Amino acid sequence: MSKIIMNKKNNDTPMIKQYLSLKLHYPNMFLFYRLGDFYELFFDDAKRISLMLDITLTKRGYSSQKEIPMAGIPYTSLNRYLSKLLKIGESAVICEQTHIIDKRTGLIERKISRVVTPGTVIDEEFLSETKNNLLGSVYYSKKRFGYATLDLCSGNFYISEYDTFESFISELQRTDPEELLIQEDFLYMNFFEKRKGIRLCKLNDFNIDSAYQQLKCHFKTKNLKSFGVYQNNLAISAAGCLLKYLKFIQYSLLPHVKSIKVRYDCNHIFMNSATRKNLEIINNISGKKEHTLLSILDNTATPMGGRLLRKWLSAPIKDIKIINKRHNIIKSLKTVYMSLSLLLKGIGDLERIISRIACRSASPKDFVSMRSALLQFSKIIFVLNSTKSKTLELISCKIKEYNSILILLRRSLKVCPSKTIKEGNVISENYNKDLDKWRKIANNASEYLQYFEVSERKRLHITSLKVNNNRVLGYYVQISKKDIKLAPNNYKKIQTLKHCVRYSTLELLDYENNVNNAKDKVLEIENYLYNELFDFIIPYIDSLKISVNTISELDVLNNLTERACVLNYVCPVISDEYGILLTDSRHPVVENLLKTPFVKNSINLSKSSNMLIITGPNMGGKSTYMRQIALIVIMAYIGSFVPAKYARIGLCDKIFTRIGSADNLAYGESTFMMEMIEMSSILRNSTSNSLVLIDELGRGTSMHDGLSLAWACIEYLAGKINAMTLFSTHYFELTKLKNYYSNIRNMYFDVLEHNNEIVFTYVIKNGFINKSYGLVVAALAKLPKCILLSAKKKLKEFYP
């Protein structure tokens, strides 16, 4: 946090006093203060940014008899450094020069032009294409949590409430906001120590009355009941703090944020943070994107489709009607998915573009991209209708053509306009008569100078006479020194060089003024016409959002169609019956990494047989099998086809995993403690409709303790909860539980033994195996032979 010291008795320069007065309003953000062609940072800001971004730290003047630390960057490099700051969760305030307010001191007026924070940026260059950029806010009171998220790039505003810290954390990790507002006295503050983008807010910022008022004012309504918001006071407090923060950073107008929605946990399959991590749905164990379910399923044609697929995978929906509708759409798309994919690639990131248009911050490039995208709409509608599918015709009805916008953008915009409207050269020729007139004056300077040069040579008989211009002198006449005696009296000498002399004339000065005025006029008219584009398109924003959301969903489903066809997936049967039946199922990720065919396996979980105790050798396929069952359930519940010969999947409300573990030393938790915490959560929260995967419970303690705990946990899951459970173990004694519980079945992964060597078959069979083949695996890992011989000897001693 920056320290701001204002001392009325010090001798700070007017510029430093101005800097400090601005900094007082944004003590926890970097202030980029424009000085000529540089942005400068002073005091603690300079020290911190020099360390963070490797910027040279210098000094400038004194304050309170101490040298002032300073760090600066060229104004042309601003966005590059802002991007780096945003990635590490920091925020910045940009202060621009406006005009001189005191000629005596040279003090220039400066104003805050924008505030840039990780959760509120909408500029394309600062955003990830594949991930929604969320601003989050959480309020904790009376052991409950209110949570709000807003995506300024789409206008999606959600609130939710949670009874436990675990359920809130699950949602926080699912949404993963770039910036999170929390109260100063938040009880679980230590959890956020390593999280980027945390902003501490005063408790009063979450005041419920103020929050209600802000929300009603924003949505222009007398109450929030029309949005389905009733007694959600904690979530409303969080949402109110979020809106207050946006006003603080000068985001007072949010025309594209039209509604607020309550998100209910019961609508989606619950997965806690351990499940998301262990199943490697979005990120792998290392936090990267490779070899994840998303990496296999994502061949989307648009960035917005990619983000929607990610959202679906993070929160699989439980509504069977919606799931079956998606399956039917995929079936209908099989004949046209290739042609649709080509058209969808021309859409780009239209979701974010229309949000920037709504906020009047769209660039010329955005309008050009919109023009290209709208050209595809009619073609997409045609392809959908050509299938004669009623399901696809209903989709096409939600996509409008927007011919009036398309005609305007084709007429008004150049094919390749400048990057910003400030540079000009954005509006097409023949679009506006006044603009064309002033452009002709501004752009015909070279013709005039050529004409003036020819006429002056002829009039004065000076063959060395040339007319030219540069930034310093403007327009000038140049005559070689041998001819300067022929220069007329109305030529005013402005520069003498080694071989020539340069002059100005009243006629050239007048023409130069006319050209400069014309250039200013061109920029003024272009800016006016550019703003007219916003005025024309903004009334269509609500309709455009519906079309864009429809195209995003179409992109995801078209992508899943392509995946189903290319990867040989089948349509699962989703019903409200109990159980999971898969025939010849495959792991969707692993099968794509193997050079040899994947070994298929089946499963049948039913009310009479809902727990499998799985034994088998290390590396035999137990963990892969368990994960593939869970991943197939997730795929089915987002509406995807699945890797199997046949699939029937019943109700599933939650998925839990206890697979692998690691010390959490930062919180003083050992491997075994982590195991027990995760297991406790599973036993407290799972139901008979939950899918539970437990891999080798009890490894982190003694064999006797581990076996006893594993036995007791299985009894609780099988006898009391009746959850659909896959329990892998090397405790062979656990297979005896089948004799006490009729719903338990023993399964094992087979191996072939030959001459003291084994071959993994990766085939699951009924029954159990009482060998783990640990020494064989150790040999495969190339442990020294002396170690292996000693281990074999000890094994015979321990278990003769």
Swiss-Prot record:
Transmembrane regions listed in the UniProt entry: none
Keywords: ATP-binding, DNA damage, DNA repair, DNA-binding, Nucleotide-binding
SUPFAM superfamilies: DNA repair protein MutS, domain I, DNA repair protein MutS, domain II, DNA repair protein MutS, domain III, P-loop containing nucleoside triphosphate hydrolases
GO terms under biological process: mismatch repair
InterPro entries: DNA_mismatch_repair_MutS, DNA_mismatch_repair_MutS-lik_N, DNA_mismatch_repair_MutS/MSH, DNA_mismatch_repair_MutS_C, DNA_mismatch_repair_MutS_clamp, DNA_mismatch_repair_MutS_core, DNA_mismatch_repair_MutS_N, DNA_mismatch_repair_MutS_sf
ATP-binding as UniProt keyword: yes
Classification via Pfam families: MutS_I, MutS_II, MutS_III, MutS_IV, MutS_V
Binding, ATP: 616-623
PROSITE patterns cross-referenced by the UniProt entry: DNA_MISMATCH_REPAIR_2
GO function term, MF aspect, one: damaged DNA binding
UniProt-listed NCBIfam families: mutS1, PRK05399.1
Similarity remark: Belongs to the DNA mismatch repair MutS family.
PANTHER family named among the record's database cross-references: DNA MISMATCH REPAIR PROTEIN MSH1, MITOCHONDRIAL (PTHR11361:SF34), DNA MISMATCH REPAIR PROTEIN MUTS FAMILY MEMBER (PTHR11361)
General function of this protein: This protein is involved in the repair of mismatches in DNA. It is possible that it carries out the mismatch recognition step. This protein has a weak ATPase activity.
Name of the protein in its database record: DNA mismatch repair protein MutS
